[in-house]
């Protein structure tokens, strides 16, 4: 396995969303948001459970009405992952979901009413130990900031965020995280850089409205990758016009690529050329689908020939190097066996699952020894 990247993370305070720590060196969490009608309890619960299965640490649910708040109560009872309620304009909805056990409130203090209503929500959050996320978005900047700056700028997003932060500071509430999202990569990145210098609270990263599954993943990888490589960010959401499950997968892929947080298999595969001795592309695509259930961190290299194959295999948990009719299988950098090219997928799946079980057992024993 490769060593972890030497990224020096920004120091921040810590909050808890349910039992999930955010900030102060805690693992960077990956979250998504449901896109069902919240009042359709069954559909929303099913989607949340699908997100749980692929590793979502936190799930956000839009709660636009009191009917949705009542549905939220039923949803919360049926899932295990911490839930964030996304609320705008009506402070009473925030108070209601707080009664029902919400794990975090996503609000902007400035758009839920006058100072007294803000105080009521914040006091409720304090009493019930519920953190708040301030969510600034370039597409919904306050009118006076639009007039002042002419268009969304990093300074405009920062000023908007600091207004909301000041609201909470005046009420002596510090259990919050902040996001300053934009669909433009450079706008979002610079906004987060400015904000990171101004506050100590955890930062929720995202490129909002990034696009479809492919283009949105690319934008998010660039924007979030830049920030994460600079040590900025404590939790993230990849926003895609796609199945929310894909947001979680891409989020973990970004963290794996930067070696910040490992979950599941990190496939290393060549783009193929005429030297390939077996169907690399078909093998990788099939294994990615078949092995989605494995959460054990592993590097698996699948290289079609001997040009780069042995070198990649040396630093992989398992590695395959293409050969004539049979390909070399490496384990922890040591050549162990040869696999039939015609039955590569099934053989390699079996070896990967066996290795994952071996690693899991070794970790279990290590934990038991530490506990003793």
UniProtKB/Swiss-Prot annotation:
Sites where the protein binds [4Fe-4S] cluster: 270, 273, 305, 312
InterPro entries: Dihydropteroate_synth-like_sf, IspG_bac, IspG_bac-typ, NO2/SO3_Rdtase_4Fe4S_sf
Cofactor(s) for this UniProt protein: [4Fe-4S] cluster
One GO process term, biological-process aspect: terpenoid biosynthetic process
Pfam families noted in UniProt: GcpE
PANTHER family in the cross-refs: 4-HYDROXY-3-METHYLBUT-2-EN-1-YL DIPHOSPHATE SYNTHASE, 4-HYDROXY-3-METHYLBUT-2-EN-1-YL DIPHOSPHATE SYNTHASE (FERREDOXIN), CHLOROPLASTIC
Name of the featured protein: 4-hydroxy-3-methylbut-2-en-1-yl diphosphate synthase (flavodoxin)
Organism the protein comes from: Salmonella schwarzengrund (strain CVM19633)
């Amino acid at each position: 396995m490769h060593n972890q990247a030497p990224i020096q993370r920004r120091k921040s305070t810590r909050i808890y969303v349910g039992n999930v720590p955010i900030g102060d060196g805690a693992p960077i969490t990956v979250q998504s948001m449901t896109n069902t009608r919240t009042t359709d309890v069954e559909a929303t619960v099913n989607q949340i459970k699908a997100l749980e299965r692929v590793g979502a640490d936190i799930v956000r649910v839009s709660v636009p009405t009191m009917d949705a708040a009542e549905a939220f109560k039923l949803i919360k009872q049926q899932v295990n992952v911490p839930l964030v309620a996304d609320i705008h304009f009506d402070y009473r909805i925030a108070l209601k979901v707080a009664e029902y056990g919400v794990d975090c409130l996503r609000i902007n203090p400035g758009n839920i009413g006058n100072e007294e209503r803000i105080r009521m929500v914040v006091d409720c959050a304090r009493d019930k130990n519920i953190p708040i996320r301030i969510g600034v978005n370039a597409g919904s900047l306050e009118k006076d900031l639009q007039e002042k700056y002419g268009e969304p700028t990093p300074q405009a997003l920062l000023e908007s965020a600091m207004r909301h932060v000041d609201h909470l500071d005046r009420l002596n509430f510090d259990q919050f995280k902040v996001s300053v999202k934009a669909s433009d990569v450079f706008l979002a990145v610079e906004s987060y850089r400015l904000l990171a210098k101004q506050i100590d609270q955890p930062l929720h990263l995202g490129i909002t409205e990034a696009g479809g599954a492919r283009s949105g993943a690319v934008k998010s990888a660039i924007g979030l990758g830049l920030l994460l490589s600079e040590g900025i960010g404590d939790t993230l959401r990849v926003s895609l016009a796609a199945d929310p499950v894909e947001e979680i997968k891409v989020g973990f892929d970004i963290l794996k690529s930067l070696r910040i947080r490992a979950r599941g298999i990190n496939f290393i595969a060549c783009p193929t050329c005429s030297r390939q001795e077996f169907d690399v592309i078909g093998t990788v695509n099939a294994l990615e689908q078949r092995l989605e259930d494995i959460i054990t961190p592993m590097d698996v290299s699948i290289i079609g020939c001997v040009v780069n194959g042995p070198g990649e295999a040396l630093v992989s948990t398992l590695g395959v190097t293409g050969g004539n009719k049979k390909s070399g299988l490496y384990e922890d950098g040591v050549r162990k066996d040869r696999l039939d090219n015609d039955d590569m997928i099934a053989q390699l799946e079996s070896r990967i699952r066996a290795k994952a079980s071996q690693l899991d057992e070794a970790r279990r024993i290590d934990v038991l020894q530490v506990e003793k």
